[in-house]
Amino acid sequence: MRFSVFTLLAISVSLAAQAQSTNVPVNEDYYHWIDRYEAKSGRIVPQFFTSVKPYKRQALIAGIDSLNREGVFTSTADQFNYQYLRNDSWEWSRSEENDSRQPVLKHLYKKKSDFLYSDLPEFDIHVNPVIYAGAGKDSQSGETLYISSRGVEIRGMIDRKVGFYTFLTDNQARLPGYVRSGIAQNPVVPHEGFWKDFKDNGVDFFQARAYIDFNISICFCFHNFLKFQ
């Protein structure tokens, strides 16, 4: 009797079936809270890794909920921070605390953290305005410095498998003298795209950030075929 062995190695790449969420925007205070509560718990939270940022919203909610069950959020301030984190990612936490008592015009800010939203199993979207203004004075030149930003932030998921994020703003600013000197030598606003001059020593620039997010799984399949004769 003779037999031969034929081994087939098949490698396939496919979209992962598990849910996919967008990232928590990188913010110093926001991430300080998360890192602080992990340190307070005295253990490593397995849902996210503090050395790898940004965190996934889905992982964040799973992590802080596990910390809450252990009694980490003890003070009034801790409970406030816990609810804030859950409200900001309510599509995963389903926080009832995020429901507005009096929505604006019945449809706006029905959730405290969202100007507009749609929460369907096949399509999830969150839309929020971006408004920012700041001013100061240059201690060397005495000039008044300022920045004014207006725009929109959009995030969501498609079928909970593909996440997407967009941040768009129009900005006017008078920047410090050393930045303007750099722009004079190399005509570009640092880290920005399209721009033009604006009034006295100011700049007008457009800022855009976006990404899509999905998981890819790599499967290694070994098939052994035995043939007997």
Annotate each predicted stretch with a short phrase:
Residues 1-22:
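Bacterial Sec-dependent N-terminal signal peptides
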Residues 21-37:
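Short N-terminal segments immediately surrounding and downstream of signal-peptide cleavage
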Residues 5-8, 33, 180:
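Intrinsically disordered, low-complexity regions enriched in small/polar residues
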Residues 25-28, 40-58, 62-229:
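Outer-membrane beta-barrel channel domains
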